[in-house]
């Protein structure tokens, strides 16, 4: 029985994120009609040949692009089963090999500046896999990328901080002027956003925060701000992000994140933790310890930080709920809170924090991970019984540390046990303070002292789109 109501049908839905094996995107194949008939044969290399009276013709391979996937309402939560041609390690290695060859042949017009942006969750996943500390892991991963031909390897902290600050400001504005669009729901998880657009559409979209995810904020910083610092056009930069889930590939491919001015995407390629492991294995590197480390780059015009792998509040998914809770308490009610206490409700993936004074609830926040909890929240909202002001939503159980593309557990270890170890590592990281010199620098030098609201809206915020359900026989489940 489906856990979801109505006519919605999901494939392989549970809270263990695995690739979907079904795709119902209808593809029209143009064929030439022959009066004499034709015969199709499969060649030794797997290609298809059509024999007609006029000779042999090789049939084109059907490919489903990321744009097709985003515009389709067939599958809902998982992008892994789609043929992703532009977001793969093979495509990355191809681009880097071609770039290295262009450098070697002094073909300067063809050379691109390659920048890697690495999130902290993949670093922790790889650190656990290779039994290294997080900072050492990051430096050795950077060394590996530099050996492949990367020009720069940076962390995501500046984008993480900007996303938190913009989210907190958006929450306070909604609380003061637009209560009907509450609870405000976090927007950094592309699996959740994709599900919301395809399943609940215009009902749910006004509740989702418009603040971009850290990946997409970093895309703007690299293609526009860093490009200006380097004196390189944005379309000459090839921007790669390393993320903990496959759905980040879909997010990077949204048309909303394509710059018409620069004629390029903010993020060109997304690879994941498990793909890094596969790349290392493919080149015969069994131990990351054998890779020569390289310092993490810091291209921003502020002092270099003391560390490059940071924790954000209590959540391994960005810390949105706790950070916004504490800020809202101070900003709206002049109450200082050192640490928000999130109590476990029905399960470990559903928690809430309440700010209550003299019996009056001032703020009620929740963290809901996994689609079971997400669906319950949505149904409460539809029934008018959701009394939260903010909900941090992540599609994966336990959040981003347990992303669907993190390195798999060793034999004899369960995913839950591995996630617990990653959470313990995360709690040992230095604590980030989003209000820092680097973030202030972005606002003053790139966003014009934050006075240009149009610029902030364009670069740090986005919009969502309802995707109509296709009426096709391929949707029918028997």
UniProtKB/Swiss-Prot annotation:
**Which Gene3D superfamilies does this chain map to?**
3.40.50.1780, Fe-only Hydrogenase (Larger Subunit), Chain L, domain 3
Q: Which Pfam families match?
A: Fe_hyd_lg_C
Q: Which UniProt keywords apply?
A: 4Fe-4S, Iron, Iron-sulfur, Metal-binding
Where does the chain bind [4Fe-4S] cluster 1? 23, 69, 72, 75
InterPro entries, from UniProt? Cytosolic_Fe-S_CAF, Fe_hydrogenase, Fe_hydrogenase_lsu_C, Fe_hydrogenase_ssu
Q: Which GO terms describe its biological process?
A: iron-sulfur cluster assembly
Give the source's domain of life in one word: Eukaryota
GO molecular function terms listed in the Swiss-Prot or TrEMBL record: 4 iron, 4 sulfur cluster binding; metal ion binding
The keyword 4Fe-4S belongs to this UniProt entry's keyword annotation: yes
User: Its function?
Assistant: Component of the cytosolic iron-sulfur (Fe/S) protein assembly machinery. Required for maturation of extramitochondrial Fe/S proteins.
UniProt name for this protein: Probable cytosolic Fe-S cluster assembly factor AAEL012261
